[in-house]
Structure formats: C-alpha cells, structure tokens
C-alpha cells in the first residue's frame, strides 16, 4: 500500500507523461495514466490496452479511437472531445478573452495562447516555418501560417462551398448567409457582422487614426490601408502576375489585371447583358440606359444633373468661374481649377499611383493612367473599332468596350 503522499507524488509525475497509442500512433495526453497499480483500480482500453487509474481518463482514450466528439458548439456546430475544449472554443464567438498579458495588456481566449504570447516578450519563439523562416510562439500559429504557403483551406461553408484557412473567417462568412449583424454602433445604430468592422466604423465618429506613417506622417483608420500606403515608400510590389510577371502593390490591382489575360468580365448589365471587367465601368455604363436629365431648349438628355447644368451654360453664355488675374472665365469648375494650378505653378498633386509613383491633379486622370499598367483598353472607336486606353476626342461617338 502507498501512503496518500506517495500516491499524490505518483499522480503529479504521471500528469507530465505523453503516451503514444499503439494502434493509431497518435500522441495523447491523459491525466493520471496508470503505470503502477494504485489500490487495485485499473481501467483498461480494449483498443490499445492502455491502463488508467480513472474511468474518465479511459473514456477520453476511447474517444481518440472512435472519433466521438459529443460536445457541440451551438454557434458553428464544431464538435469537441472534452467539455473544457468546448468552453474555450465558445470564447471565440463571445469575444471573451479572460487571459491577460501583464506586459502589454493583450488578452487571449485560452491560457495556452497566453503562454505562447509571453514567449515573445522573453525573446523565445520555438516554432519556425521551414519555407520562409518566420518564427512563432505557438504551434497553432505556425500551422495557420503554413496554410498561406500550401493554400490549404480546411473550413468549408455548407451554404456556398467557399473554403477558409481560419475557423474565425468561416464564422464571419456564415453571417453573410444568415444576415446576422451582432455588433451595433451606439452612435448611429449601424450594425456589422464582425467586431473589427465595428471598431473601424467607430473611428468615423471619433476621428481616430491609429495607424501613422513615420515617413510622411500620414495616418489611417484601417490597418490594411496603412500597409498598402507603406509600399509607396518601400517600393514593395508583392503581388505578381503569373502570365506576364507584372507586379502590383495591391491584390485588387492584380485581380483586375489578370482579367486582361483570362478575358473574365464578371460585372454584367441586366438591361443589355453587356459585361465589364470593372464595377466602375458597369456603373458608368448603366447610366446610359437612364437619361433622366433633359435640356428644355434642345431636348438633349444627360446621365447626371451636373452635366445638364454645364450644358445649359452654353445657351446662357455663362462662365461662373472667374480668374481674378486676367478676368478669364470658365464653364467648368474643373477647368478653372486646372488653369489655377497651372498659373500658380503649384506642385500639389493629390492623386498618386502606388505602382509607378506618378501623381495627378485629378482622380479621373489617375484612373485613366491605371489602364496603362493593367493593359485595359476600355474605349472603342465606332469608326475604326480600335481599342483605346484613353477616351477619344470624339467621345460622344465612342462607346465603352464591354
């Protein structure tokens, strides 16, 4: 017989032992694995012949063989072997992070995640990616990171068959099907499907711009916009086209460019069934179907009220934009601004393209310039049927390419 103290010491040691299942070869961590018989109470697993001193430990072992996971999450239907695993998982949905780091005040769902994070303060990162050499404090973080190299997306949406590399991304995606928006803004009552979207939105009320560039002192509300901006200074273009090896600073620019090679035109007009490579081109085209603004003098129609106002100035010979230096007048405000900039020889160029660092006075000039890089020719001449990168002088007689 063992004294209570001896039994306690034996159990403490046994908690630290990992056991390998002889049938499946899996490493399993079982509390109080039986090595020495205690009080004659032995529970043996019929599958792998392992012995245990507690019935609960035997049940856990048997579930590794049967695959049974009786604890189910009501939010995402994920299942677990132990109730404690379910409890930890549910914190993801509730955004509950009870484990806080004393060094930097970061908080975590699970105590193991906190332990992994604390290694970063100690300078210890034990898990290294074999492909790119990045280090991680937790094996789970390394596993998720490796999916960026392998392209593995193990989390499947049962509604639309979309796949995701993270379970949290799947949870958020499912809300697009259910319409659930659990995160509500207290200022304007706008609701969002993700907490990060709510946090970003709240900055429109507070004016907070936490992401600041140390090169030019520009600041941003969103981290993603900040990352894209930094590439202006570094010249980094991480997104490469596999067909022509052109590189881009933004993934969205690469996606649009690739349509030049594939011929894909995902934006379709429901009126005439014409298709377009860009959503902006579709919106501009759709306006041609609804000529709602008419000139009473010539019965000419326009897509925008601003175009009608400019047209009417021709009849009235009105030039509302006056230049004080020489009393020149302009029909269009944009012509006046352009002339003003030219005469003052200002170097203010507000619209900058990150691919080649060229800058422009007007957003329309920037949009036209972008077509040079992606190889798109959105305008077609009705006379020669040639594709053009820029709108031809006889733009009224030219229609956009589908």
UniProtKB/Swiss-Prot annotation:
It is found in: Cytoplasm; Nucleus. Gene3D superfamilies: Classic Zinc Finger. GO terms for molecular function: DNA-binding transcription factor activity, RNA polymerase II-specific; RNA polymerase II cis-regulatory region sequence-specific DNA binding; zinc ion binding. One of its GO terms (cellular component) is nucleoplasm. Keywords: Activator, Cytoplasm, DNA-binding, Metal-binding, Nucleus, Phosphoprotein, Repeat, Transcription, Transcription regulation, Zinc, Zinc-finger. SUPFAM superfamilies: beta-beta-alpha zinc fingers. The modification Phosphoserine is found at residue 391. A zinc finger (C2H2-type) spans 43-65, 71-93, 99-121, 127-149, 155-177, 183-205, 211-233, 239-261, 267-289, 293-315, 351-373. It comes from the Eukaryota. PANTHER family: C2H2-TYPE DOMAIN-CONTAINING PROTEIN, ZNF44 PROTEIN. Belongs to the krueppel C2H2-type zinc-finger protein family. Transcriptional activator. Important for maintenance of pluripotency in embryonic stem cells. Binds directly to the POU5F1 distal enhancer and the NANOG proximal promoter, and enhances expression of both genes. Can also bind to numerous other gene promoters and regulates expression of many other pluripotency factors, either directly or indirectly. Promotes inhibition of MAPK signaling during embryonic stem cell differentiation. Significantly enhances POU5F1/OCT4-SOX2-KLF4-MYC (OSKM) mediated reprogramming of mouse embryonic fibroblasts into induced pluripotent stem cells, and can also substitute for SOX2 in this process. Interacts with POU5F1. This is Zinc finger protein 322. It comes from Homo sapiens. The gene is ZNF322.
